Design a protein with these regions (language model features):
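Cys-based phosphatases of the PTP/DUSP/CDC25 superfamily and their flanking regulatory architecture
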Residues: 1-173
Length: 173
């Protein structure tokens, strides 16, 4: 989740998990959601949520990550915090899709997805073109990476990562 519930006095996202750990809420006549625990860090919140089908007793555990350091329509001031968030996101991901959302679902989410895709390409030592990544994303969902600042931020984050990798290479060298 790349938004806060309320930003600038406007509701950006309705809360879809219980407020209090160990509290269960029925979503409908079949699904029960329980916030198992939450942990507040500097720029994001980690929530462990349990979704139970009360008819079948099937339980799914969801790790919900809420990045809180990203202003609406802007960008984080530094790439490090977002990279920490992405690193943790990749660490907890076991299988299935990673689901991301912000308020409109294209600005911050699009920027996160673009950066994550390019980081994956870098880890495979593959060629990449950020503008092509964004173009392909926009073929699937119009408006991904919503503002010029977000587009520039994609380049800034990747440049930061490449410089760090180059510095590591020079040290071990």
């Amino acid at each position: 989740m790349m938004t806060q519930e309320v930003e600038g006095g406007k509701v950006k996202c309705q809360r879809y998990w219980p407020d209090t750990p160990r509290t269960a809420e029925m979503v409908d006549d079949r699904l029960q959601i329980t916030l198992i625990k939450d942990q507040y860090l500097d720029n994001f919140v980690i929530r462990l949520i349990e979704v139970k089908d009360v008819q079948t007793n099937e339980i799914q555990r969801v790790t919900h990550l809420n990045y809180t350091g990203w202003p609406d329509h802007g960008t984080p001031s530094q790439p490090e915090q977002l990279l920490t968030f992405i690193s943790y996101m990749r660490h907890v991901h076991r299988s299935g899709p990673i689901i991301t959302h912000c308020s409109a679902g294209i600005g911050r989410s699009g920027t996160l997805i673009c950066i994550d895709v390019v980081l994956g390409l870098i880890s495979k030592d593959a060629d990449f073109d950020i503008s092509d990544v964004v173009r392909n994303m926009r073929l699937q969902r119009q408006g991904m990476v919503q503002t010029e600042d977000q587009y520039i931020f994609c380049y800034q984050v990747i440049l930061y990562v490449l410089r760090c990798l180059q510095a590591e290479e020079n040290i071990s060298g």
